């Protein structure tokens, strides 16, 4: 082991700024106003951006594009981003966050998947025709009632799994580089690139990030920047674990927006606390399984009802629950499902 591997946080560019994100810190609320004036006036702050400063699409999402880049009307979970700051140091950026004033009108909270389906449950996304239901996945095979009639024994149980943190070793880190960046303007080079014989000059907006889906990152960043995908480059650095937790956008778009706004490289590194707060988790589930079997061990029928808690935004929920539903019988041949 040489210890020479470089992850996103190991890259340093001349003239680089450091970014932080102002989170909602309330689970469900309408935004009445956002005041960033004091943060903008703090010495060492180079940019403070809100939803009004996004030149392109103010939303991202791998499957459903429903997650705001920066919230301007409403927040739907405590980790929602409302404003981003780029400053000379991470400490100055953090101090600027404390100066951003947000006036919220807090709303009722829905905290689990079953409660979310109640007729009087608060709607997280008012524009969705099915309320809080993202997708209803149906699997049908054979005749379940005939299968249970042929069973000698029926087991009917409800199982629950909790929300699970992926807990990768490396917290999220993104570095945005503006198009036409020239490091010599700041009197230096990027050592990590020089070691590979690469120039630190960039002809398009570039994002360095440890990501599981870099091409999706490119397309979503381009949409937010209001440019074509071929005008954005994503460099997938080595990744200190992901396990599904680095599929969604976290700091990639924010770093790119700040880089273009300041015309300087911008690094956004999450603390462990922020990482735990922000990224999507493995779904909490409630699973009712009714299984029929004969005394000689043959499964005659399975009836499964699964509820998955996708949280505030779709992420990969419909894919995860499609997999869970189609695998509900496990590795067994069951004629009636």
Name each region found by the language model.
Residues 2-337:
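Structural alpha/beta core scaffold segments of enzyme domains
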């Amino acid at each position: 082991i040489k210890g020479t591997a470089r992850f996103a946080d190991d890259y340093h560019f001349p003239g680089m700024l450091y970014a932080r994100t102002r989170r909602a810190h309330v689970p469900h609320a309408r935004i009445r106003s956002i005041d960033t004036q004091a943060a903008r006036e703090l010495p060492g702050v180079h940019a403070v951006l809100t939803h009004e400063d996004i030149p392109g699409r103010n939303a991202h999402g791998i499957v459903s594009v429903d997650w705001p880049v920066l919230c301007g009307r409403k927040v739907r979970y405590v980790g929602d981003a409302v404003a981003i700051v780029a400053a000379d140091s991470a400490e100055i950026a953090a101090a600027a966050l404390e100066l951003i004033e947000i006036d919220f009108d807090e709303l009722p909270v829905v905290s689990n998947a079953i409660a979310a389906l109640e007729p009087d449950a608060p709607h997280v996304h008012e524009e969705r025709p099915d309320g809080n239901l993202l997708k209803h996945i149906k699997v049908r095979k054979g005749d379940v009632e005939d299968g249970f009639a042929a069973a000698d024994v029926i087991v009917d149980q409800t199982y629950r799994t909790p929300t699970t943190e992926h807990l990768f070793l490396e917290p999220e880190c993104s570095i945005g580089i503006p198009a036409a960046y020239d490091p010599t303007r700041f009197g230096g080079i990027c050592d990590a690139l020089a070691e590979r014989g690469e120039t630190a000059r960039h002809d398009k907006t570039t994002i360095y990030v440890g990501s599981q889906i870099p091409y999706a990152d490119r397309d979503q960043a381009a949409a937010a920047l209001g440019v074509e995908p071929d005008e954005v480059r994503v460099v997938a650095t080595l990744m200190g674990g992901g396990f599904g937790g680095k599929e969604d956008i976290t700091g990639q778009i924010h770093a790119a927006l700040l880089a273009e706004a300041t015309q300087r490289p911008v690094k956004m590194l999450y603390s462990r606390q922020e990482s735990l707060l922000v990224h999507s988790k493995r779904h909490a589930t409630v699973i009712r399984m009714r299984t029929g079997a004969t005394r000689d061990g043959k499964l005659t029928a399975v009836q499964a009802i699964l509820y998955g808690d996708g949280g505030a935004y779709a992420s990969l929920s419909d894919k995860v629950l499609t997999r869970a539903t189609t695998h509900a019988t496990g590795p067994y041949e069951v004629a009636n499902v």
